[in-house]
Swiss-Prot record:
GO terms for cellular component: cytoplasm; small ribosomal subunit. The keyword tRNA processing does not apply. InterPro entries: Ribosomal_bS16, Ribosomal_bS16_CS, Ribosomal_bS16_dom_sf. Residues 89-141 are annotated as: Disordered. GO terms for molecular function: structural constituent of ribosome. Belongs to the bacterial ribosomal protein bS16 family. Gene3D superfamilies: 3.30.1320.10. Residues 89-101, 109-129 have a biased composition (Polar residues). PANTHER family: 30S RIBOSOMAL PROTEIN S16, SMALL RIBOSOMAL SUBUNIT PROTEIN BS16M. Pfam families: Ribosomal_S16. This is Small ribosomal subunit protein bS16. One of its GO terms (biological process) is translation.
Length: 141
């Protein structure tokens, strides 16, 4: 069975993760079938290859709990279920994604025209999420 999971890399206590498609019986840091994204928990930065992820999900790949949470935060699971605009480059802040989830409205994806180096056959979509550094305090009532 193919799983979408995190592959750890980086220094001690400065870890980052790649989101990869791997056989479920492979070791955590083994050779992946395909690299599909990046997650840095220290800076809360996430980059996702949206078409690659939706293709793997359609082929029956199962995301781990952590990867599922990352995909939900980026609205990739909703996009893959509805098939809406998975070819566009998506840039989403955490506040926008949270607001869209609570209001049950789809986030409008805008094409990223910054890099024109990639041809149409090689184009990959990416989703980027960045958590705000100032989180409101949690009050205990």
């Amino acid at each position: 069975m193919i799983k979408l999971r995190l592959k750890r890399y980086g220094k001690k206590r400065e870890s980052s993760y790649r989101i990869v498609a791997m056989n479920s019986d492979s070791r955590r840091d083994g050779r992946p079938l395909e690299e599909l994204g990046f997650y840095n928990p220290r800076t809360d930065e996430t980059r996702l290859d949206v078409p690659g992820i939706t293709r793997r999900l359609e082929q029956g790949a199962q995301p781990t709990d952590t990867v599922r949470d990352i995909l939900k935060k980026a609205n990739v699971l909703e996009l893959s279920r509805t098939g809406v605009n998975t070819q566009a480059n998506v840039s989403v802040s955490h506040a926008e994604s949270t607001e869209a989830i609570t209001n049950a409205e789809p986030i409008q994806a805008t094409a990223n025209t910054e890099s024109n180096e990639v041809s149409d056959s090689e184009s990959t979509a990416t989703a980027t999420i960045r958590e705000s550094e100032e989180q409101p305090p949690i009050s205990e009532s």
